[in-house]
């Protein structure tokens, strides 16, 4: 389902509610002041969610996919209550947040540009690559290996113990909690 209103002057807002019984969802693109809320579990091979501006994306039930790709730009926010995936990719460009409350993945790539925040202490991942450019922050839970790269004042806090390879250019920090 795609709703667009480019170039239209709107003096009031319409609320769209889309209900479906499908548990399979492949891609979501939310922009503007849109909210996307999934109240049911989601399964599939791959799920990609892009959110920008002031969007709120909430996945309230378990997401179980082969690859989960979460992208935030601007000041959008995402909340995933529970996930299970082989490959997790989280990217923030701006001041948005991604909050992953519980679950596990086999490997994860976390990337923050500017001052966004990834909160993922509840998601255990054996292999993690985390890169921050700017003053963003990440709270993550690598169980075997962490490759951490910071350019700027970013902060990576991780649950340990784990093997850590780190490269910091600037005043950023990588610390075990």
Regions inferred by a protein language model and the residue ranges of each:
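Short, small-residue-biased leader/transition segments that mark boundaries at the very start
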Residues: 1-2
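Solvent-exposed adhesion/ligand-recognition segments of exported proteins
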Residues: 5-6
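Leucine-rich repeat
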Residues: 13-16
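Short "repeat-start/strand-capping" segments in structured domains, especially the N-termini
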Residues: 20-28, 40-49, 60-70, 80-90, ...
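Extracellular beta-strand-rich, repetitive "passenger/adhesive" scaffolds
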Residues: 30-33, 52-54, 58, 72, ...
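Serine/threonine-enriched low-complexity regions in disordered or flexible coil/loop segments
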Residues: 34, 55, 76-77, 96-97, ...
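Solenoidal tandem-repeat scaffolds enriched in leucines and small polar residues
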Residues: 79, 92-99, 112-116, 132
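Short, low-complexity, Pro/Ser/Thr/Gly-rich segments in the mature regions of secreted, periplasmic
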Residues: 163-177
């Amino acid at each position: 389902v795609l709703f667009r209103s480019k170039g239209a002057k709107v003096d009031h807002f319409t609320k769209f509610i889309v209900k479906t019984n499908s548990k399979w969802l492949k891609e979501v693109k939310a922009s503007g002041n849109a909210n996307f809320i999934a109240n049911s579990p989601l399964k599939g091979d791959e799920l990609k969610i892009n959110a920008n501006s002031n969007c709120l994306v909430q996945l309230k039930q378990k997401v179980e996919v082969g690859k989960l790709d979460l992208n935030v730009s601007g000041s959008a926010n995402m909340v995933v209550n529970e996930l299970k995936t082989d490959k997790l990719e989280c990217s923030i460009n701006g001041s948005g947040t991604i909050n992953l409350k519980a679950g596990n993945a086999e490997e994860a790539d976390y990337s923050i540009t500017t001052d966004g925040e990834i909160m993922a202490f509840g998601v255990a991942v054996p292999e993690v690559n985390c890169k921050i450019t700017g003053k963003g922050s990440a709270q993550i839970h690598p169980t075997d290996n962490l490759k951490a790269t910071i350019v700027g004042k970013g902060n990576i806090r991780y649950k340990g113990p784990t093997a850590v390879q780190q490269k910091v250019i600037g005043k950023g920090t990588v610390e075990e909690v």
